[in-house]
């Protein structure tokens, strides 16, 4: 089977660990991922939370690049609604100039926090965060140096211009996001750990391929491997996915019912909260390898980004070891984005 494996680490704060210890564990995991043959290591952006330590992926990416030698390091992702595309391009151009060919720029559409943190991130600016497609298009133009003459910022450059551009990805969980990535001709990562509906995944894959047949369609998927399927199932426990549905039509995934309720209250809209079973791949390494092979064939997945949502440090690390390209004897060849 011809696909590659990467890791998404949200820097989960295990009970009793400090923020400092948590971030050092992310560094250690990135270094181990490199040794195990993983193609990419991504970190996330979450704000005003006591459960995850990664709030500034661009800063963490720079540190991880300095602490590793060859693995691709990137954001999974930068929440572009909060920021100037120009500044994001500058940040990642600096990184790509320091570590040519190793920098991934994953862009997310979600807020990464509650309405209050969104307000804080946009405080003192004219930014309303409502023009995502325009922002993403401008960011792509800055990176590829293709700003059209009719644009009011024609002639601007996000310096320094690196010899090797950062690899640009859009992250999402809907056919609409896949269509946007396809139309822009950039790589797409479907977040199955957020939306586990395989019918939606199939539609997203088909939509993306219709716009960008030779593009990269990757899948970020929740998975846990253990020596036995019984142990893996026990480790997963009764995990839920929690969503808040706003009257405006927006739906967002939160980490708990309490946070979903808080999001709804801070939004000022009428809302409902829904919980359902988290669809996490679990079993032995061979079980999960069979699942990945199946997804690769059915949906033409080029790459899997593994997310392991448990708070037991040893068992989480062991899962990444068991699912590593070295252990599964996968030939890793990173596709040029």
Language-model-derived ranges and their functions:
Residues 61-69, 96-103, 180-183, 206-212, ...:
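Acidic (Asp/Glu)-rich catalytic clusters
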Residues 126-155, 199-299, 331-334:
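An alpha-helical appendage that flanks or caps ligand/catalytic pockets
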Residues 5, 37, 45, 64, ...:
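Conserved, mostly hydrophobic/aromatic
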Residues 1-68, 336:
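N-terminal beta1-alpha1-beta2 module of alpha/beta enzyme domains
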Residues 2, 7-19, 82-147:
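Flexible, glycine-rich active-site loops centered on histidine and acidic residues
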